[in-house]
Curated annotation (Swiss-Prot):
Lineage: Eukaryota, Metazoa, Chordata, Craniata, Vertebrata
Membrane-crossing residue ranges in chain numbering: 218-239, 271-293, 305-322, 343-363, 379-400, 441-469
Motif Selectivity filter, chain ranges: 426-431
Molecular function, one GO term: delayed rectifier potassium channel activity
Residues exposed to the Extracellular side: 240-270, 323-342, 401-413, 434-440
Source organism: Lemur catta (Ring-tailed lemur)
UniProt note: domains: The transmembrane segment S4 functions as a voltage-sensor and is characterized by a series of positively charged amino acids at every third position. Channel opening and closing is effected by a conformation change that affects the position and orientation of the voltage-sensor paddle formed by S3 and S4 within the membrane. A transmembrane electric field that is positive inside would push the positively charged S4 segment outwards, thereby opening the pore, while a field that is negative inside would pull the S4 segment inwards and close the pore.
Residue ranges annotated as intramembrane: 414-425, 426-433
Protein name in UniProt: Delayed-rectifier potassium channel regulatory subunit KCNS1
Length: 529
């Protein structure tokens, strides 16, 4: 039975579960080094059967020569077979000649998994390590992918191939829904920008109030008012499309500019017009306030939600400019045709008000998750469109061949594309239907093919949306909890907050955690493998 003789401090963490502790009465004895004479192996500086003392990241272990001899190609196997101290020093980071101990500045958790490899001959993947960090550790110790156990090899290779892609595409990894500390630290870095700014403390408070709905009671009230204004604007736009308002708009179109009034003044209902002005004033206030309070102007214009805010108010001001141009050109004798074209442009600008509904994404986790899903699912969307294009082309050609003699709307293959699209997506409006047996069989195949083809990418997109939603909720919870601790500390401090102070706090916290991990146990016991 393979025995690994171990002596040293006990590393209390989750990785120690890989190696079961030995009975308390287990003892280890090291063969004495002869006082004179050369060992049988011809190695002048240590015996060939002498146990190897190693210290990896503070974890001290003593490995038997017989265990290392089974794997001579590994780093420890080559270290055991080293012919001289100089050759051995090339394989380790440091060597203590007095204690005859080799030191390696490597990950201690992987070393415990390495001990398990020397005992069983199989290496298991550690979920605590990044796939690239695990690969680097395995390469350093001289282990290849063939050393991986069969239960972990497929998962390791899959993660290694998928890891270069963005973090949002690792939706199959359960831990990927946890909030990323870098994402939380981005908010801290944004707050630190106010340290050297003018009125930084006040701007910092106002910015957090507008950007973080869970920051304080005023921020929650501001969020509720903003949602109410967005809903009121959408309701006013919908009411304006009712028949009675359309009739009034048609009557206003007959009016000429000779009366000295703008068509907008005649067309719009006074109540709706006042409500529209109020909504525009509120939206303009939001955009200008966020622009003035933003810690970085460049980052402000790069944020998608801020661009949505700008687009929501842009149509109103463009329509206003068009109306001013319409009134000015009227006195200059503008023709009716030119006025008609300008009026169509105004209508397009008014139609752009529908984008105001996207402002709700600032207050909705689901909408933000949907936007992130669409942004990072372009591969799946491309596959979906490719499947639909192939299916529509094939079944449209079959339907055209079967129904071209009938007067049912299948006159050309491009005319059949509409029928193929609504059939493959299982919408089935019924405006165009086949009447022959061959056409009905083609329609049945089109519907069944659509169910099978469309369902595959949709499932992937849905899983990705679920992943994004869980991640967004976890990130919001982490930022909210961090707001109760770190944000309050920042706001109560002086304006001289800097990145250096934040870095010092992180280093202090890290030193405290390292001290807890590296603290030796009161009575370490040897272990046997």
């Amino acid at each position: 039975m393979l025995m690994l003789l171990v002596r040293g401090t006990h590393f209390e963490n989750n990785w120690s579960k890989l190696i079961p502790p030995a009975p308390l009465d287990a003892t280890v004895s090291e063969p004495p080094v002869p006082d004179s004479g050369e060992p049988d192996s011809g190695v002048p500086w240590r015996r060939s059967d002498e146990a190897l003392r190693v210290n990896v990241g503070g974890v001290r272990r003593r490995l038997s020569a017989r265990a290392l001899a089974r794997f001579p190609g590994t780093r420890l196997g080559r270290l055991q077979a080293a012919k001289s101290e100089e050759q051995a020093r090339r394989l380790c980071d440091d060597y203590d000649a007095a204690a005859r101990e080799f030191y390696f500045d490597r990950h201690p958790g992987f070393f415990l998994s390495l001990l398990h490899f020397y005992r069983t001959g199989r290496l298991h993947v550690l979920d605590e390590l990044c796939v690239f960090a695990f690969g680097q550790e395995a390469d350093y110790w001289g282990l290849g992918e063939n050393a991986l156990a069969a239960c972990c090899r497929a998962r390791y290779l899959e993660r290694r191939v998928a890891r270069p892609r963005a973090w949002d595409e690792d939706s199959d990894t359960p831990s990927s829904v946890d909030p990323n500390p870098d994402e939380i630290s981005d908010v801290q870095r944004e707050l630190a920008r106010y340290g050297a700014a003018r009125c930084g403390r006040l701007r910092r408070r106002l910015w957090l109030t507008m950007e973080n709905p869970g920051y304080s009671l005023p921020s929650k009230l501001f969020s509720c008012v903003s949602i109410g204004v967005v809903l009121a604007s959408i309701a006013a736009m919908c009411i304006h499309s009712l028949p009675e308002y359309q009739a009034r708009e048609a009557a206003a179109a007959v009016a000429t500019v000779a009366a000295g009034r703008s068509a907008e003044d005649v067309r719009d209902d006074p109540v709706l017009r006042r409500l529209e002005y109020f909504c525009i004033a509120w939206f303009s206030f939001e955009v200008s306030s966020r622009l003035l309070l933003a810690p970085s102007t460049r980052n402000f214009f790069c944020h998608p939600l801020n661009l949505i805010d700008i687009v929501s108010v842009l149509p109103f001001y463009l329509t206003l400019l068009a109306s001013v141009a319409l009134g000015g050109n009227n006195h200059g004798g503008t023709s009716g045709e030119e006025l008609g074209h300008l009026g169509k442009v105004v209508q397009v600008f008014r139609l752009m008000r529908i984008f105001r509904v996207l402002k709700l994404a600032r207050h909705s986790t689901g909408l933000r998750s949907l936007g992130a899903t669409l942004k990072h699912s372009y591969r799946e969307v491309g596959i979906l469109l490719l499947y639909l294009a192939v299916g529509v082309s094939v079944f449209s050609g079959v339907a055209y061949t079967a129904e071209k003699e009938e007067d049912v709307g299948f006159d050309t293959i491009p005319a059949c594309w509409w029928w193929g699209t609504v059939s493959m997506t299982t919408v089935g409006y019924g405006d165009v239907v086949p009447v022959t047996l061959a056409g009905k069989l083609a329609a049945s195949g089109c519907i069944l093919g659509g169910i099978l083809v469309v369902a595959l990418p949709i499932t992937i997109i849905f899983n990705k949306f679920s992943h994004f939603y869980q991640r967004q909720k976890a990130l919001e919870a982490a930022v909210r909890n961090s707001g109760h601790r770190e944000f309050e500390d920042l706001l109560s401090s002086v304006d001289g907050v800097s990145d250096a102070s934040l870095e010092t706090s992180r280093e202090t916290s890290q030193e405290g955690r390292s001290a807890d991990l590296e603290a030796p146990s009161e009575s370490p016991k040897p272990q046997i493998y």
